Amino acid sequence: MASANQAAKAEAKKVIEKVAKEVIKETKNSAQRNQGPGKRWNSKKGRHMPKNNNNKGMKRTVDNEVKQKLKKEGLEGPRSRFSVRVSATIGKIGPNKEQGPELQIATFLHPSLMKEPNDGTNFGPLQAAAAQWGLWRLSSLEVKCTPLVGSSAVTGSIYRMSLNLTQSPGNASWGGLGARKHKDIPAGKSVSWKLQRGDLAGPRQTWWMTDTNEEGGQSCGPMLEIHGLGKTSSTYQSQDWTGDLFIVEVLGRWEFTNYNAKPALGTLDRKSEDYASDATGPGIMVGDDGVMKMTLPTASSLARFMSDASERSPVNEGSVGETIWHIVDEGAGLASSVAPTPFSWLIKGAWWFVKKLAGRSGANADEQYVVYASLADAQNNKPVMANRFDHTKKATTLTVTQVNSPNTGPGVTQAAYHTENPFPLVPATQPPPPRSIVVVNATARPFGYVKYNTGDSNVKSHGKFDGTQYHFTLKRGSTVSYASAAYILTDVSMLTYEGNRVTGCYDPGWMEPTGITVHYRNESSAFGRVLAYEIDQWGSTSDNHFTIGVWLVQTIKDLPAHDTTVWPYIPLPYVSAGNCTAPPVQVALDKACVPYLTKVGVTSHQQCTVRQPQVRSGTFMLVYSIGTNTPATTAGFTTGQPLGEATNASALPEGKISTSGFWERALSAVAPYQDFISVKFTLPQGPHADPRVDALLDLIQQRFNLKPVDASESEDEDEDSPSGSEEEPCGEEPTPPQPTPRLKLAKEMMYEALRDSDWTHVDAEALLAAISSKN
C-alpha cells in the first residue's frame, strides 16, 4: 500500500513540476511581448510607482493549470459527490502511570469508526454517509485537545499526537513517534493540530474504500495515536494524578463518492471497560500450539459485546470468527507487564487485533480471542506465533472497536436501528448459536400421576418397571441414560441471554438435534429427539451426591393414551420417624432421598397404576431423572440407574449453586395439573446427526422384516395391566436376544427389497452400511 501511494505521489509531483515550468515560461513570454520598446525606461520602479501584480496573477494561473492537468491525468480520482463536516469526540487523555511512552488513544479516521466509546450504534450523519457511499477521503482535519485541568495542577508528563498510515502497530519509542508527522501537547495547555488532504490521502487516487471487509490498507484510513511520556503527578499533593487531563475532539470534512449502500457499516460499535483487579482482568496466553490468545472474563461487558452475535453464522467449536476487533490497552496493564517473546513489542505497543475463538472448557471459563499483529494479518488469518507463555491476567482499561461486519446488508432478524418499541419479539426462523444460554418458558403438566385406586391423585409419577426399564431411555450409540418422569409442554417459547441482556427469541422447532434419541421404555424405535440438556450434580464425594438430568425433547411419533403399571418412587427430604398425625415429623436436614412409594397400610413396595396421556408427534417435553447416579463423561448423559436402591438417599452439602432452575421441581412430589415452567439450558458446541434418519432406518427394517423382535417387548402389554401384586421389582437386566439367521442375511434381503421397490434414487450401499452398523 505504501509503495503504491508513494508512486502515485511521485508521478503527481512530476506532472506538477512539468506543468508549472510550462506555465511560468508561457507567462514570462507573454509579459515580454506585451511590453513595448518605448517603455523600457519604466523597468525600474520607484517608490512612487504602483506595485506589479504579475507574480500573483502568475501564481493563480499556475494553480489553475495544475488543477486542470491533474484532473485530466486522473491523479485525483473521481470528483466528490457528497461531503459532510462533523465534529466528533474520540475519547479522553488520562494520566501516565509509568515513565515510558504509554498509549492513550488509538483510533482509525474511518467515518464509521469516528465515535466516542460506549456510544453504541448511534446513527450520526457521518455513519449514515459511510453506509451509503463506497469511497471516502478527508479533505481537512483538525484535532483539538481541550484541557480538563490547569497546567499548575499536574507535572511530569507531556503528550504527543502522531499520524500512523500503516494500519499496524510498531515499537513505539518517543523518538520514533517524533519521526512521524506529530504535534506535542503540554499538560494543561489547549492544542490544535491541523492536517491537510495531502497528509490523509488514500491509495486510490486520494480515496479510501468504505467497506472495511476489503484489504485493510485500502479501507480503514490513517490512524491517530496519542502517547504520553513521564509519570503524571499532582503538584498540590504528594501523590499520583488520577483524573483525566484532556478531552480530544476532531473537526473534519469527509468527502464521499461512488454510491454503494451497505447499511451494516453504519452500526459498527466501540466500547470501553475498566478492569479493577488482576483476577477479573483480561489476559494473554500462548499454548502448546504457539498461537497467542487474549482472554476476557465471560461475565464482562466486553465479552458480551464481542460475542457470537456479531458473526454472520454460528461459529463451530475451535473455529475462528469473521469479525475483527481492534484492541487498545489504554490502561497499560498488559503493555507494562505481559511480554510473550518474540512479540513482546506488540503487547508493549498497546494495540492489536483479535478474532473470537469459538468454544470454551466450561461455563465459567474465560472467552478466548486469537491475536493478530496487523489488520492485514487478521483478514488473512495469520495469527501471532510466539513462545509458550503462561496465562497472565492484569487490571487495565481496554477499548474495543468493531472493525468490520461480515454481513454488510440489512439485518434480517434484528433491526440495526429503530425508534419504536421492539416488542412483541418475533421468533427467529433459525437455530440459536452453539453454546448459547437459552431459557425455555412453557405451560407444563406432569406426564402422569400415581394411582392405587380410582381416587384423586396429585403425586407425580416417578416410574420404574422391572429391570432397567424406566418411562424413558436416552441413547446415542452405545451410551444409555434413564429418565423416570417428564412434563408435557405447550405454548413453548425460548429466549437467549448474555448476562442480563435478552439477545434473541427463537422457535424451539428450529433447534439443531443433539444426536440423542429418546425411547419410550426400552422400545427400539425412537420416540423423540433431544434438543438441549442440562446435567447437574449436587455433592462431589463418591457416596454423597445427587444428580438431575433434564432433557428438552421433541417427539417424532405419537404415543397413545393408556394405563401402565409401575413401581413408584417419590423425591423427599429424608424422613427419620413420626407422621403427620403424631408430630413432629423428624427429618434429616442435610439429606434427600427418592424412596419407594406405597399406599397407606402397606409396608412393602407396591406397584401402582399410571394413566399416561396421549402425546402427539411434534410435542415438546421435559424428560428428567433424579437419583444417586452421576454425570457421565459423555455430554448429555448420566451414569447407571437413578433409582437403583431402596431409599436412594444421600447427604448433600450446603451452598449448592444451580443454574438450570429445575432442582425444586425435581425434588417436589406434588404438582398441579398445569403450571408455568422455566428451565435454563446451555446449548452444546455443535449439531449432531438428525435422529430422524435413525427413525427412518427403523421403519425400513420393520417394513422388510430385517430386525428380529425382542421377546421381552411382546410381554410389555401383559406387564402394563394392573395386577395388584406386591412383589419386589426384579433387579436383573433382561438378556439381549442372540443374532438370528434372518438378521445375518439382512444385507441380501435389503438388496432384494430395494430392487423390488424401485427406489432408484436411494444409495443402496450407504443405506445398507447404516443398517448393518445399527445391528
From Swiss-Prot:
GO terms, biological process: clathrin-dependent endocytosis of virus by host cell
Which residue ranges are recorded for the region named Disordered?
25-61, 707-743
Top-level taxonomic group: Viruses
Gene3D superfamilies the record matches: 2.60.120.20
Q: Where is the composition biased (Acidic residues)?
A: 712-731
Keywords of the record, alphabetical order, are: Capsid protein, Clathrin-mediated endocytosis of virus by host, T=3 icosahedral capsid protein, Viral penetration into host cytoplasm, Virion, Virus endocytosis by host, Virus entry into host cell
One Gene Ontology cellular component term attached to this UniProt record is: T=3 icosahedral viral capsid
Positions of the region Basic? 2-71
Q: Where is the composition biased (Basic residues)?
A: 41-50
Instruction: Write out the ranges of the annotated region (Inner core).
Output: 72-264
Q: Does the keyword Transmembrane apply?
A: no
Q: Where is this site: Cleavage?
A: 314-315, 364-365
Q: Which family does it belong to?
A: Belongs to the astroviridae capsid polyprotein family.
Under which name does UniProt file this protein? Capsid polyprotein VP86
Q: Which organism is it from?
A: Mink astrovirus 1 (MAstV-1)
